[in-house]
Amino acid sequence: MVRLTIDGREAIVPEGSTILEAAASLGIKIPTLCYLKGVNEISACRICVVEIDGFERLVPSCTEKAAEGMVVHTNSHRAKTARETNLKLILSQHDGDCTTCVRSQNCHLQDLASELNIIDNPYPRDVRNNEWPANSYLIRKESKCIKCMRCIEVCDKIQTLKVWDVKGSGSRTTVGVRLNRAFTDADCALCGQCITHCPTGALSIRDDTAKVTAALEDPEITTVVQVAPAVRTAWAEHLGLTREEATVGRMAAALRALGFDYVFDTNFTADLTIMEEGSEFIERFTHRDQIGRAHV
């Protein structure tokens, strides 16, 4: 075990623990942005920097290991100033039009700017616009990307599909599809993990809400909605309903009230789905050496 002092409090943590983990064990929150435990630990954003007695420079707490006798200051003037400066530099290259962003009020970067009380930014704006076509399944907006590399790491380490990669160098660094392929040619499974872990609105799914609304308002169109089993749980969580409150009948009634002509539950074909996915897995497993074990 390692014994150290953080903000005047003693912490005892297992050897190999980071300062970030040691602080968390005391209930001390150190702001982070690019960090994803066990997935993305590259200290790229430098938001989690802390001051350590005897260290000339500030260090990123997400990668710096706790050491015996270490004295850490997570909220010193020097650490706070560096943290705010680093965030302002990130914001200077970010499209800050939050009112039209799909992640507004659910954005890690927005929350962090509020937490650190970032009101003005003296740094000149350098925002690059390279938005994907609106008809793509997945939408990427370079103007929102902060180069945290979360999407790259979660796709590599969790999904093992390696769709994303770093492109360019220096100030021109960005994220794109590996090997400069078109997104349609990548091995993307459309799992949504990169969207879920993106801290901004740089990645999102295509929004067809306007098309659905138009179809519901058109008397010449018969509208049908088919609900997957997972949705029955997801909608309840979003609205804060209990399992008893979130009945299938209640959900179907809400969809009918919206104007859908027919509402179906995917349960009635679940057996076919299982057979199809099972057959696909057997095919992939049988030919795993040809297609690569990572894609099984």
Residue ranges and their predicted role:
Residues 1-9:
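Eukaryote-biased recognition of intrinsically disordered, low-complexity regulatory segments
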Residues 2, 15-69, 75, 79, ...:
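Iron-sulfur-associated redox domains of electron-transfer enzymes in respiratory
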Residues 8, 177, 227-229:
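Short glycine-centered, acidic/aromatic-flanked micro-motifs in structured strand/loop junctions
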Residues 9-15:
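A short N-terminal beta-strand-loop micro-motif at the entrance of redox/enzyme domains
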Residues 13, 145, 188, 245-246:
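Short alpha-helix boundary/capping motifs
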Residues 18, 108, 150, 193, ...:
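Short Gly/charged-rich anion-binding patches and loops
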Residues 46-190, 196, 203-222:
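Fe-S ferredoxin-like electron-transfer domains
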